[in-house]
Amino acid sequence: PHVASGGAWKARAAPIRLQAKVALGLYPLPERTPLNPVITGRVDRGDYTVENVSIETHPGYFLYGNLYRPKLKTDRKVPAILNPHGHWAEGRLVNRKEGSVPARCINFAKRGMVAFAYDMFGYNDTKQAGDHRTYANDLVSQLWGINLMGLQTWNSIRALDFLETLPEVDRSRLACTGGSGGGTQTFMLGLVDDRLAAQAPCVMVSH
């Protein structure tokens, strides 16, 4: 239906958000338990740094990624961008001429923004609950009580929570961008979480 104003869109969006959360198994949202972030392995590249991160998105379930931070010369707060990856063998470490998640995050950091590249379920370091192709295909996986898209979206929500804990981050300027499956994750996060000031899903499910 035609939406004539911002207010009309907010009214239209509310039931869409609710329907999406129900379909994802995220209604009501799970409890936001402590993230217990661990940041290690700092590498200094001159005008930016790269660190390894783990956060506990569910009790006993850990999400891993890399945090790219600019070397700031002032105390001003900066934007922060989530960078979910697509269905590529290398996951968040993909570095090809067609596209590179590390290069994208380095670019953001060099432009004065914090960037967090984190694993899709079953990739790289985030494999403790199985593979994304077979998740919930067996009774043990189903004991988690959440579907794959819901789990991935919850990981994105908690990754956004993590960015909000960083002292240099401007919480009013949070964003998300990704390609392919990362574009789908960007789309879904923006659908259920209104904290994003900007989102750029690329080559995702609707194309």
For the regions a language model picked out, list residue spans one by one.
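Short alpha-helical segments and helix-capping/turn motifs at coil-helix boundaries
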Residues: V50-N52, F62-L67, V94, S100-A103, ...
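Non-catalytic accessory segments flanking enzyme active sites
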Residues: P1-R69
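Cap/lid segment of the alpha/beta-hydrolase catalytic domain
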Residues: T74-T165, V205
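Glycine-rich phosphate/pyrophosphate-binding loop shared by adenosine-nucleotide-utilizing enzymes
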Residues: F62-L63, P79, A197
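Primarily recognizes the serine-hydrolase "nucleophile elbow" in alpha/beta-hydrolase
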Residues: R158-H207
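Generic recognition of flexible, low-complexity loop/linker segments
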Residues: G41, V53-S54, A103-R104, L163, ...
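Short, flexible loop/turn elements at secondary-structure junctions
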Residues: I55-P59, R69-K71, G86-W88, G122, ...
